[in-house]
Amino acid sequence: MTVETDKQTLGFQTEVKQLLQLMIHSLYSNKEIFLRELVSNAADAADKLRFEALVKPELLEGSGELRIRVDYDKDARTVTIDDNGIGMSREEAVSHLGTIAKSGTADFLKHLSGDQKKDANLIGQFGVGFYSAFIVADQVDVYSRRAGLPASEGVHWSSRGEGEFEIASVDKPERGTRIVLHLKEGEESFADGWTLRGILKKYSDHIGLPIEMRKEHYGEAADKPAEPEWEAVNRASALWTRPKSEIKDEEYQEFYKHIAHDAGNPLAWSHNKVEGKLEYTSLLFVPGRAPFDLYHRDSAKGLKLYVQRVFIMDQAEQFLPLYLRFIKGVVDSSDLSLNVSREILQSGPVVDSMKSALTKRSLDMLEKLAKDKPDDYATFWRNFGQALKEGPAEDYANREKIAGLLRFSSTHDTTGAQSVGLADYVSRLAEGQDKLYYLTGESYAQIKDSPHLEVFRKKGIEVLLLTDRIDEWLMSYLTEFDGKSFVDVARGDLDLGKLDSEEDKKAQEDLAKSKEGLASRIKAALGDDVAEVRVSHRLTDSPAILAIGQGDLGLQMRQLLEASGQAVPESKPVFEFNPTHPLIEKLDAEQDMDRFGDLSRVLFDQAALAAGDSLKDPAAYVRRLNKLLLELSV
């Protein structure tokens, strides 16, 4: 290395300072993870060089043998990670090592909890593993030169992790990046060949290019060669190209951690080779936890794409639908050209066929997880259930398959857990039941005792309880399952079909006819606030209820539209009353029109509250209620 020039001292971005403090104070409970992160970055640099060299072969500078070298010096207390990948220019070193360029930095820091294990996962997901070097090092030196730049445009970046870094220009004949870690006192154990080999074998055996270390020579010093001999300490073959029978679960798990930047294990994986008209290999994973930015519009999604084992791009979104954006993995195709671009991937029979097959394979993987490991599937559902609920709207062809993977709360399970599958629900249908009943609301606590459920409890009929904000929208696309239609128990004039006997139906009609006068009086009292007033067939214990018009938006959809600033179509509820309830009998007998109006209004407002809606004029409700209570106390 020659004399340094153009030396500057620069400050870290504020967010990096915060991150460094977390790292330095042992955020990772497992310190050896630093080597996995730095080797993973070196492998990415090799992938990027391979890809850019497809168009500019001169970037290889006459040497296409890509490798990573890990070395150590016990006396100097250093560990060195050296790669001959793409390298960095001076500007890139400042940008990549001095700032966190990825969007959502504030969100990332906001999600840090102080829990070492959880925060370590976040850091991996966020792709800032370079800073893990400061867990074991009190100084980090980076020497780099971008492929294609002259030797004189090498760069030396150095920092002690204390808020600033130095950067200077140096001569660097070889392209790529060399990172020298000056180990802290107490971390000398990492400057050891046996230790480093063990860590590399544990975390990086799946890396698809050689990770080399110096051969260890024992015995007489005279036997040592003048020049160091390097040997690969990993398999150096892409994991997905190996036969499934030869790959251990631990290898799949470490490969997942490498591509997903996740410290936890996946819940499931599927490794498949397709031969014939199309030829490609896929390795797909279901993560064990959701990234914090799963629902951000610009969150990282898609598979790593390789063509004939040459890395093409991260986050190729074209091979899976958006509702499966949580799936991680690799697809390696023999049918795409090496100069494929994102634009070319937008359409075409090859991509469409691969997308269809990979979607089916992902859903099959989830079906198997649900069947074989229900506890793990419950974990999956807690993390990704709402994303999967987008499926019926996006993927008509797989609607029934997706529906079978959905989980809901129901009146069958009093815990409120979303654990009921539609197949389970269908298996418990009452005799004569040909509809699938559901009720939407803000929370399980809010709707578990809803008046809308009274007649179903009386008849012993299970009702699905849908409490996610997306649920009402979901049900506008998911209209049937197993040949049976879904029915919202809060919508329209409830018809229980064969669940009501002919005698029951005749009695309901006669009762409704006998109360037409009362219905007209209540309608006059409530005026334009209701679309209709009628006798209810839903109620057994409550005096009144509000039903949604058959074509109107429910409360969830209205709230979603309001929250997004969109216009909400005006709709009026249907007021239904229970003619056998003592309060309704008292109302029917009331001759004082003012008092009748107040009673009708109080019943209307109470029905709105029971439905989870807010009152337009809560002060008027309280005033009327107080007035009626005073009259009762006289």
Swiss-Prot record:
One protein family per Pfam: HSP90
Domain of life of the source: Bacteria
NCBIfam families recorded: PRK05218.1 (NF003555)
Family: Belongs to the heat shock protein 90 family.
Main location: cytoplasm
InterPro entries per the UniProt record, alphabetical: HATPase_C_sf, Heat_shock_protein_90_CS, HSP90_C, Hsp90_fam, Hsp90_N, Ribosomal_Su5_D2-typ_SF
GO MF annotation list: ATP binding; ATP hydrolysis activity; ATP-dependent protein folding chaperone; unfolded protein binding
Subunit structure: Homodimer.
Annotated stretches, region: C: 560-634
Classification of source organism: Bacteria, Pseudomonadati, Pseudomonadota, Gammaproteobacteria, Lysobacterales
Subcellular location: Cytoplasm
Disulfide cross-links: none
Protein name per the record: Chaperone protein HtpG
Region (B) location: 343-559
Cellular component GO terms, alphabetical: cytoplasm
The keyword Mitochondrion appears for this protein: no
Alphabetically ordered keywords of this record: ATP-binding, Chaperone, Cytoplasm, Nucleotide-binding, Stress response
Spans traversing the lipid bilayer: none
